[in-house]
A protein has these predicted regions:
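Ribonuclease/tRNase effector modules and their secretory precursors
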Residues: 1-79
Length: 79
């Protein structure tokens, strides 16, 4: 689990394009940022950093977050 991401959970955001992309990829119609935050905070979420991004894996979903800006880049269902 990555403490830096969890300590900055309130800084997590996304762009308008990110919202559309994530809603489409995950087939959801809810607040994307809150949905992702809830997944990240789940005790079963596997959080790891690779390069400049955090990856959060839970419930067959992968959420990609920029480690500098805490912007959700994308989220998709594992293939």
């Amino acid at each position: 689990m990555n403490k830096e991401l969890l300590n900055n959970i309130n800084k997590i955001l996304t762009t308008t394009m990110g919202i559309d992309r994530i809603k489409k990829n995950l087939n959801i119609n809810t607040d994307v940022v809150e949905f992702c935050k809830n997944k990240i905070l789940d005790k079963n979420c596997n959080i790891y950093k690779q390069g400049k991004n955090y990856y959060c894996e839970i419930d067959n979903i992968i959420i990609t977050i920029n480690s500098y800006s805490f912007t959700i880049i994308t989220a998709h269902i594992k293939k």
